[in-house]
């Protein structure tokens, strides 16, 4: 597998949960769009969503992907475990958020992942996933993997 997309807590509710912030697309809509882009670029992609921190840590540790795209959702601000998992595997990842975390409540403005991420994309709604995948494909091509 080339790219793994991980979605954290409550992202299974996209399309229903606060559409004025997160938009109307479901996680399935986003995944289908990403799958098409990956297929058109001869890149393999897999998707994982969990509301449980330990399951996300396990998935990061077990991943054979060349690069990971992650929307850690609320765990962005609280999960030292997810941060440590990325440090342990020493694999590039792109942090993505549908909303601009720096234009939200004060407690949402600190990311425990941004400083160790390959790159970060905030505030472009579902299009942010497309931007992240394009950059992941660029990374794979640059590395010649």
Curated annotation (Swiss-Prot):
The protein's enzyme class: lyase
Keywords: Amino-acid biosynthesis, Aromatic amino acid biosynthesis, Lyase
Binding-site residues for substrate, renumbered to this chain: 71, 77, 84, 98-99, 108
PROSITE patterns, alphabetized: DEHYDROQUINASE_II
Residue positions of the active site: 22 (proton acceptor), 97 (proton donor)
Catalysed reactions, as listed in the record: 3-dehydroquinate = 3-dehydroshikimate + H2O
EC number of the protein: 4.2.1.10
Gene3D superfamilies cross-referenced by the UniProt entry: Dehydroquinase, class II (3.40.50.9100)
Annotated site residue numbers, Transition state stabilizer: 17
GO molecular function: 3-dehydroquinate dehydratase activity
Pfam families per record: DHquinase_II
Subunit structure: Homododecamer.
Family to which this protein belongs: Belongs to the type-II 3-dehydroquinase family.
This protein's name: 3-dehydroquinate dehydratase
Source organism of this protein record: Francisella philomiragia subsp. philomiragia (strain ATCC 25017 / CCUG 19701 / FSC 153 / O#319-036)
